[in-house]
Amino acid sequence: VSRPGKPHDTVDIKEETKVKIDSAFIGSCTNGRMEDMRAAANVLKDRKVAPGVVLKIVPTTDEIWLQCLEEGIIKTFKQAGVLFSNAGCAGCAAGQVGQNGPGEVTISTGNRNFPGKQGKGLVYLASPASVAASAVAGYITTEDNIPDVPANFDFQEQAQRFEIAIEKEKTKEEKPFEIEGRVWLIMEDNIDTDMIYHNRYLQITDPN
């Protein structure tokens, strides 16, 4: 698993086990493939997403979305309580369906977790199976360590944490909504999100 803010800061997932999560995300250009959808479905079959946790899943392409429909994977996701979205590669980018808020802790299959990349909260990176397992448990874990009963966390504590984070956001210096620079037109299909909007600019502008 990669710890928040630094995708290269990887540790054994056991070191982060039991970290409470508020949301989980499976998708992006790196982990929204058919094999990723199947891995998540295998974990979620006959299980439910933990109370207080939101699991969002975004397949990479329409072809994968339709294959999920054909294989009954979407039904598995829906029965588990998943928010299953239209296809796209930008689900893990701030402003998209995978975005998190101030004080929120997310475990994600995105390719980056720089500050601001997926919203204003903290983002851990993990495999699709581990993300699905964590969504069921309510905390970071692996598919072979899912509890029979999800963790029960204090809603008041969670609400207070969000409130404190939101108040801190209000005291931060306002960031510009617009930036100026040169525009490059690249007529290629294999463009990644860093080429579209580089991660070093994610904290320069306000994603909202």
Locations of the language-model features?
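Fe-S-dependent hydro-lyases/dehydratases of central metabolism
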Residues: V1-N208
